[in-house]
Amino acid sequence: MDTISGRKPDIEHWSKLSFFEQMANLYSEIGRTLKWKNKNNEEMAQKAFFRALDIFDVLIVCHTKKYDTLRELCRLRENFCESFMESDLDNLSVIDKDLSHYAYSLRIHK
C-alpha cells in the first residue's frame, strides 16, 4: 500500500489496536495539524496532514468489513481534507475536539 507521506504502514499492527487506540492516534496527528496551522507553519502542517491521511487510509483498510465505521471514517476524512484545504481552523478544532474523547477514554481505561 502506497502512502502519501512515504511511510510504509503496518496494517497488521494497526488492525491489532483497539478502535479507541486507533482513533487516539488519529487524534494526535490531527492535533498536530491544527497546532501547526494555528502557528502558520504550512510546511509542518502539511507533513502532519499527510501523516493523518495515512492513518485514515490504514484505518479504512482495517475497517472495510464494518460498514458503519467505514462510512464514518470516510466522512471524517473528507471533512478533514476539506477543512485543511480551506484553512477552516474552526472546523479543524471541532474535529480535534470530537476525537479527543477517544484519547481521554483510552487514558481512563488503561
Give, region by region, the residue ranges found by the protein language model.
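Surface-exposed peri-terminal alpha-helical interaction modules
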Residues: 1-110
